[in-house]
Amino acid sequence: MFPSSDDADPVNADVGSEGQFAPWLYVRNADSPVEEEKRFPNDESVTFRAQVDAWLGHIFPGASANAASISGTSYSRLEFRLGRSSAWSRPANIGYGLSYAFPLVVALLSAHKGQIVVIDSPEAHLHPRAQSRMGEMLAQFANAGVQVLVETHSDHILSDARLAVQKKALKAEDLALHFFSGAQEGHGNGIVSPTTHSDGRLSDWPEFFFDQAEIDLMALASH
């Protein structure tokens, strides 16, 4: 069971610090129309519940979600399935990545243009392909006017943000990057903020900035 909240504001897309209010917000918005620029590409459905399924299904093929109020209580229940012929399962009985992604999708779809959505580690519990698709989704919502503030350690998330710029799906000036390497003597405050060119290239690539995969591949190739 998931709680409702007198403090959470559906207008401000507040799903709670741990996503605990996401099912409640889903129930409130389930049959509301979603703005066209936030809909999954080439998907004709317009309702909130259908768009939640469209985006979840993009990250986790075949996945869908359902939430409903529990009669006589202030709680909601949440279920997932991994295919139309699959049985509905509680979040505890399904992969954690889906449970973690659900509040992110609900928050992004609920947010209005200009509102800020703060996301910590959207790549959590996702394999590389799913991380890449998460990056695509974040870029589209940013392009739709939602201010998406992300803390990430995923090179896949970064790469898809840059690809969105290259594909003209996101303006270069709308992608701000900040790399926190820690303050070191003689190196300022340890924050580097490379700018993004229109082709997705970065103006600067600091040491230790998403470079470990390349370092490892070079080491493998040298032997």
PLM region descriptions:
Residues M1-A101, A107, H112, T195-H223:
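Phosphate-coordinating catalytic segments in nucleotide- and nucleic-acid-processing enzymes
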Residues H58, E136-A144, L158-H223:
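RecA-like P-loop NTPase motor core
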Residues P103-V106, H156-D160:
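Short amphipathic alpha-helical face segments that pack within enzyme cores
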Residues K113-I116, G145-L149:
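Loop/turn-to-beta-strand initiation segments
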Residues I119-P122:
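Walker B catalytic motif
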Residues E151-H153:
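H-loop/switch region of ABC-family ATPase nucleotide-binding domains
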